[in-house]
């Protein structure tokens, strides 16, 4: 492992520690349980799961560092020149499923790939982002989430936030439902057009922004009263989350195809979920407003104060 990979690994381990500590404080009840694991094909990781807390029904913050002799199809399909290269993949990936339907589900991921072949220059890239999936949307929350995303991108150029915001909208789209998974945020992949230090700094900016984006929303919503109606709608909407993750998510597919640890890969799935045949919210209801207003490709900062 070279110095660059060591630096990325040290940052990711620290990021996992910081996020887990902050979420434990916010929950106030449950604590993360760590499961350190090794991958037979090379590498390993630290899976941390929190369940049945005062705030978090289920959450996972996973660090992994895996390596192998060749990239799986999910990673090389759009970069065929990488076929046959050995690889190292490091990342932190997290999903938080709160119990209260008024607190959105959040997802974040930052990762680094390096692919090598004897006699050729290494090929490396960064990826990551964060996105928000509300069940009962609040415009204030969407604006805050996107403002933090914009501010994280700002030192790297005015064009960066719009580019990765739009990519997030496209990436987290449930094609068979023709609807977004949530209200978006940032998504980037194959980032190597800058030099290594700048690219690494951008990944850190995104990783560090997650708590700044999510915790104020949690603090605003976690005491909101709810009943069985809201809970059942949350479970139905979680079904969309499961559909997306198992059918489209590149990280999930990469993990499964590369012989990754199934329990860690599938930690993103909610603990309870429901499907109903052709369930549609009542017109004019708060539930209908989710899809009619919030689950649209929208510039949340257009009308918001700077």
From Swiss-Prot:
E.C. code: 1.3.3.3
Pathway assigned to this chain's UniProt record: Porphyrin-containing compound metabolism; protoporphyrin-IX biosynthesis; protoporphyrinogen-IX from coproporphyrinogen-III (O2 route): step 1/1
UniProt binding sites for a divalent metal cation: 97, 107, 146, 176
Cofactor(s) demanded: a divalent metal cation
Swiss-Prot/TrEMBL keywords: Cytoplasm, Heme biosynthesis, Metal-binding, Oxidoreductase, Porphyrin biosynthesis
Cysteine pairs bridged by disulfides in the record: none
GO process annotations (BP): protoporphyrinogen IX biosynthetic process
Role this protein plays: Involved in the heme biosynthesis. Catalyzes the aerobic oxidative decarboxylation of propionate groups of rings A and B of coproporphyrinogen-III to yield the vinyl groups in protoporphyrinogen-IX.
Similarity remark: Belongs to the aerobic coproporphyrinogen-III oxidase family.
HAMAP family: Coprogen_oxidas (MF_00333)
This protein's name: Oxygen-dependent coproporphyrinogen-III oxidase
């Amino acid at each position: 492992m070279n110095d660059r990979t060591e630096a990325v690994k040290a940052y990711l381990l620290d990021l996992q520690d910081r996020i887990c500590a902050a979420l434990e404080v916010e929950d106030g009840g449950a604590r993360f349980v760590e499961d350190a694991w090794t991958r037979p094909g090379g590498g390993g990781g630290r899976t941390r799961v929190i369940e049945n807390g005062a705030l978090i029904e289920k959450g996972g913050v996973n660090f992994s560092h895996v390596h192998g002799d060749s990239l799986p199809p999910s990673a090389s399909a759009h970069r065929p020149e990488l076929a046959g290269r050995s690889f190292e993949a490091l990342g932190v990936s997290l999903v938080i499923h709160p119990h209260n339907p008024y607190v959105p589900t959040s997802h974040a991921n930052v990762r680094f790939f390096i692919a090598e072949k004897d006699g050729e220059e290494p090929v490396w890239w960064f990826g990551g982002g964060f996105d928000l999936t509300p069940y009962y949307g609040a415009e204030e929350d969407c604006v805050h989430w996107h403002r933090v995303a914009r501010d994280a991108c700002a030192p790297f150029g005015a064009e960066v936030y719009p580019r990765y915001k739009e990519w997030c909208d496209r990436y987290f789209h449930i094609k068979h439902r023709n609807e977004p998974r949530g209200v978006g945020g940032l998504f980037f992949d194959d980032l190597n057009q800058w030099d290594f230090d700048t690219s690494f700094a951008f990944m850190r900016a995104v990783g560090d922004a997650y708590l700044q984006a999510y915790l104020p929303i949690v603090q605003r919503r976690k005491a909101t009263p709810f009943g069985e109606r809201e809970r059942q709608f949350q479970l139905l909407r979680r079904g969309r989350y499961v559909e997306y993750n198992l059918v489209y998510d590149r990280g999930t597919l990469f993990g499964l195809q590369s012989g990754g640890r199934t329990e860690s890969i599938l930690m993103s799935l909610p603990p309870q979920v429901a499907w109903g045949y052709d369930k549609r919210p009542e017109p004019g209801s708060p539930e209908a407003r989710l899809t009619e207003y919030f689950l649209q490709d929208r510039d949340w900062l257009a009308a918001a104060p700077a």
